[in-house]
């Protein structure tokens, strides 16, 4: 037996040794994504990159002409046969069938372009500044699956510059003060700002070097050619003092920053430029190696030192020459953003002179913002220089549904057929949302014989959406090019329209159409992680779309002197903000605490934690020192909405409702001061606000099947723990386990406490929890003669203890005995608990009753006394939430009965409580 084992191992080793590097890396990629699937990768030769796959026996055979082609083939298998989408976020699960899907007939595809670019300098600020290796590892795998082979790779360059500037006479203190804080580094690297939130800690500089080495190693192993930076003329102001004869001048002001943050530019025509370029590239090559691709931009959103065509031609020619003199194989990748952004100065004559000054084929232009303006059409295809057609799609990491699907599809076709594009890419400023649009654009780099409608239909399947959902989204919602924008909730409050161009909330579609599509998505009731992501992202947009009308009604009521009406509408506005905050909180990528915790992970001391947290707060709020870029990076995130946007709107509502006339100038001044104070304090955002709900759902059947509607209420309100009364479990009336079903729809854990056996199944109470359930109990309660048995479901999470009860509705004595049992059980098990303890449910008792009086001896009512029953004729309060007096105290933030949209879901209204811990 041992002999056979040795032979088997030997065969395995021989087969492994026979694998090509591309086959090994493709296998390693599959091992990280779908480790238990049986896949054989075969590298084959072809004149263009291509893939082909089919099932042979019990394994998938995947042929490809490169590791990139095999990765694209693997992604198509995942998309079309496993019906799954691999997220670019490391923490998102990959949902795949347990049984490996069979491919009966071979499927193939081939590359239409050889260059597939991804990323933007800004992405390293708006999304990636705090990433660790685990984040990069998943993202690089995602890029490989999409066929990306030219990733921008600018991490870690500060260490290179540190060594270079030391050689030119600067001290370490001067160098670190020249750098910005981590979140603002992209704009420092692009010669826009110096010193903002500096000095940069040495630990950050060193840590980024090690991270970049890991990034480049993995990208290269997957057949990518990382695009590294090169010197683009940006120098410290101190260099002008050290080299007074050099052609060093200040660049034009940028972003409203003061003179102390202004950048300085060394002209490429100066002899010192080549010396610095040589030193930079040699040190970068020593640390990171090279693939001979260099991405650098000389004039990103700043003026050139001269607008004379001959001068600019000389600058372009010398900039390229400085790189080529160090690396004769150098290829310059240059953003075409400047040609769009500053069309006033970059005239056709100047663009032609600038581009033609570089040897033909040695510079490739990224046509940056084609969904708005394909610059290749305005420049005679960049005067013969190769270019990559790019979709931008997101500014500032904004979380808004945007992107012209049909228009961009047509423009891609035009660029490939008529424009001679040599590549396709994406230049998103931040990840934000709308990931599917980037997946679509990158898929167009390959000929896969799939129409747009077929691609959208496949998107339905892998997003677990209703059939035709994404086609409707593409045709009705995704109509306009993205811009710097957001929802009005994220804007500084104003009386009408929007306060700033940075949060332009124009909606190019009928919001009612999105409401209808969102309802379809909810009713479909998927239970996958990607479905829940869509629900949160689209749902936040739905809630955001409702806000402008409320603001307009509020302002109109105030101006008309109808203060009571205005106050009521103001409460609605605050509640809508709270709902959006709660809904965003269901997704980790939409949480401010995730952003801040990631920043803090780079710290080596409490002082550094505060420093990194400030950098993280600064970018996504005020951005700069003046109001020029305030809210540019707005995003409807949990925690950011609660602790930043909502206080602004509360201040606005209070000022409008005050007895004194509203002073808009004073409000904006005070609002700016409040914003600056929050950023300076850089508070910790955590799960400090918890939302509880109790709901007698009547087996989800009082008015037809109400489960999807109730799940929607829970999701919109952001309830993290929900108590349910009157649940069926696998009985003849409802053959499914109702609690497990609704928990699955929401992605929650659950615990059921059977009260009685019923119709060959069970009936009772239950709890669902968004966070892990650490302990659970099912407690039987005393039974009255002739009455149904009763039970109590108890769960303990990291945040609290939460119990669900449904007390007897017939016998007085039995009800009192049930309360006595409950009180005794908690005294024995949770007396003096360091967590809050809650008792929720349908008590079948009025507030003034003896039963509630007995409960109140041990418990404090925290949910109010509004009517909860019945939904047809509300006249009783019998559903409550209590907090245990002998446990950790809480501060109630709000408590209410939810009547809006719940009158046909059950005969009881749900009760909602928001609280935070008292410290």
Predicted feature locations:
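C-terminal motif of bacterial Sec signal peptides marking the signal peptidase cleavage site
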Residues: 15-17
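Contiguous, structured surface segment used for ligand recognition
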Residues: 19-113
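Catalytic domains of carbohydrate-active enzymes, especially glycoside hydrolases
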Residues: 134-160, 287, 714-720
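Structured beta-strand-rich core segments of catalytic domains in phosphoester-bond hydrolases
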Residues: 721, 725-801, 807, 889-901
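Metal-dependent phosphoester-hydrolase catalytic domains
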Residues: 778-780, 784, 813, 817, ...
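N-terminal, active-site-proximal structural segment of metallo-dependent hydrolase catalytic domains
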Residues: 686-745, 757-761, 823-824, 916-919
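Sec-dependent signal peptide recognition
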Residues: 2-10
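Catalytic-core regions of glycoside hydrolase
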Residues: 37, 85, 89-100, 119-123, ...
């Amino acid at each position: 037996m041992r002999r056979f084992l040795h032979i088997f191992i030997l065969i395995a080793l021989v087969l492994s040794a026979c694998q090509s590097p591309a086959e090994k890396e493709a296998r390693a990629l599959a091992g990280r994504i779908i480790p238990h699937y049986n896949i054989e990768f075969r590298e084959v030769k072809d004149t263009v990159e291509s893939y082909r796959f089919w099932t042979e026996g019990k394994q998938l055979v995947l042929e490809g002409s490169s590791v990139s082609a095999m990765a694209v083939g693997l992604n198509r298998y995942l998309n079309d046969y496993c019906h799954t989408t691999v997220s670019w976020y490391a923490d998102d699960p990959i949902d795949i069938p347990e049984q490996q899907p069979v491919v009966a007939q071979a499927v193939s595809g081939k590359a239409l372009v050889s260059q597939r670019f991804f990323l933007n300098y800004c992405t390293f600020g708006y999304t990636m500044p705090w990433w660790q290796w685990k984040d990069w590892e998943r993202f690089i795998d995602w890029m490989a699956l999409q066929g990306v082979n030219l990733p921008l790779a600018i991490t870690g360059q500060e260490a290179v510059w540190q060594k270079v500037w030391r050689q030119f006479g600067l001290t370490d203190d001067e160098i670190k003060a020249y750098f910005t804080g981590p979140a603002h580094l992209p704009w420092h690297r692009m010669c826009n700002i110096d010193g903002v939130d500096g000095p940069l800690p040495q630990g950050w500089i060193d840590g980024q070097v090690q991270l970049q080495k890991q990034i480049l190693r993995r990208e290269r192993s997957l057949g990518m050619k990382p695009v590294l930076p090169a010197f683009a003329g940006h120098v410290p102001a101190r260099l002008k003092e050290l080299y007074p004869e050099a052609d060093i001048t200040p660049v034009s002001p940028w972003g409203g920053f003061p003179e102390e943050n202004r950048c300085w530019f060394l002209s490429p025509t100066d002899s010192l430029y080549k010396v610095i370029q040589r030193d930079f590239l040699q040190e970068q090559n020593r640390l990171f190696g090279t693939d001979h691709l260099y991405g650098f931009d000389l004039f990103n959103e700043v003026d050139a030192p001269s607008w004379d065509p001959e001068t600019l031609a000389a600058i372009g020619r010398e900039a390229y020459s400085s790189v080529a003199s160090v690396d004769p194989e150098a290829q310059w990748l240059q953003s075409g953003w400047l040609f769009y952004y500053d069309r006033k100065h970059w005239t056709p004559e100047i663009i032609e002179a600038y581009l033609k000054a570089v040897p033909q084929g040695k510079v490739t232009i990224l046509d940056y913002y084609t969904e708005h303006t394909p610059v290749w059409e305005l420049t005679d295809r960049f005067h013969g220089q190769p270019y990559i057609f790019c979709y931008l799609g997101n500014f500032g990491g904004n979380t808004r549904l945007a992107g012209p699907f049909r228009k961009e599809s047509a423009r891609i076709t035009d660029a490939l057929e008529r424009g001679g594009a040599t590549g396709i890419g994406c230049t998103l400023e931040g990840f934000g949302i709308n990931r599917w649009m980037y997946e679509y654009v990158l898929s167009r780099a390959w000929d896969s014989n799939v129409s747009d409608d077929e691609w959208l239909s496949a998107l339905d399947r892998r997003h677990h959406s209703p059939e035709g959902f994404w086609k409707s989204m593409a045709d009705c919602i995704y109509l306009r090019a993205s811009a710097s924008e957001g929802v009005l909730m994220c804007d500084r409050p104003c009386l009408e329209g929007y306060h700033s161009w940075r949060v332009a909330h124009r909606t190019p579609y009928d919001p009612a159409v999105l409401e209808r599509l969102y309802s379809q998505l909810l009713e479909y009731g998927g239970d996958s992680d990607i479905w829940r992501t869509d629900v949160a992202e689209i749902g936040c947009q739905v809630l955001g779309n409702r806000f402008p009308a409320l603001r307009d009604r509020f302002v109109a009521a105030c101006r008309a002197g109808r203060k009571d009406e205005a106050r009521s509408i103001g409460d609605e506005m605050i509640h809508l903000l709270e709902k959006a905050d709660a809904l965003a909180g269901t997704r980790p990528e939409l949480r401010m605490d995730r952003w801040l915790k990631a920043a803090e992970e780079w710290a080596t001391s409490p002082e550094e934690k505060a420093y990194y947290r400030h950098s993280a707060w600064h970018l996504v709020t005020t951005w700069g020192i003046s109001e020029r870029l305030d809210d540019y990076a707005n995003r409807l995130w949990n925690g950011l909405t609660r602790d930043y946007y909502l206080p602004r709107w509360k201040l606005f509502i209070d000022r409008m409702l005050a007895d004194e006339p509203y002073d808009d100038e004073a409000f904006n001044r005070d609002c700016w001061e409040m914003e600056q104070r929050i950023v300076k304090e850089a508070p910790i955002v955590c799960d400090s606000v918890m939302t509880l709900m109790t709901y007698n759902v009547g087996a989800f059947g009082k008015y037809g099947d109400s489960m999807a509607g109730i799940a929607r209420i829970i999701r919109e309100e952001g309830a993290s723990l929900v108590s349910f009364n009157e649940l069926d479990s696998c009985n003849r009336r409802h053959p499914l386990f109702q609690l497990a079903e609704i928990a699955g729809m929401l992605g929650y854990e659950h615990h059921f406490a059977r009260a009685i056996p019923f119709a060959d199944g069970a009936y009772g109470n239950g709890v669902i929890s968004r966070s892990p359930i650490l302990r659970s109990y099912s407690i039987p309660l005393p039974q009255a003669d002739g009455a149904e048995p009763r039970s109590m479901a108890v769960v303990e999470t990291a945040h609290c203890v939460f119990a669900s009860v449904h007390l007897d509705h017939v016998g007085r004595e039995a009800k009192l005995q049930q309360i006595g049992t409950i009180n005794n059980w908690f005294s024995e098990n949770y007396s003096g608990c360091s967590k809050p303890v809650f008792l929720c449910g349908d008590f079948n008792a009025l507030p003034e009753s003896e039963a509630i009086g007995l409960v109140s001896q041990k418990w404090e009512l925290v949910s109010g006394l509004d009517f909860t029953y019945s939904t047809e004729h509300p006249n009783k309060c019998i559903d409550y939430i209590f907090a245990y007096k002998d446990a950790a105290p809480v501060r109630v933030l709000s408590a209410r009965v939810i009547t809006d949209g719940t009158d046909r879901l059950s005969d009881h209204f749900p009760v909602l409580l928001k609280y935070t811990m008292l410290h």
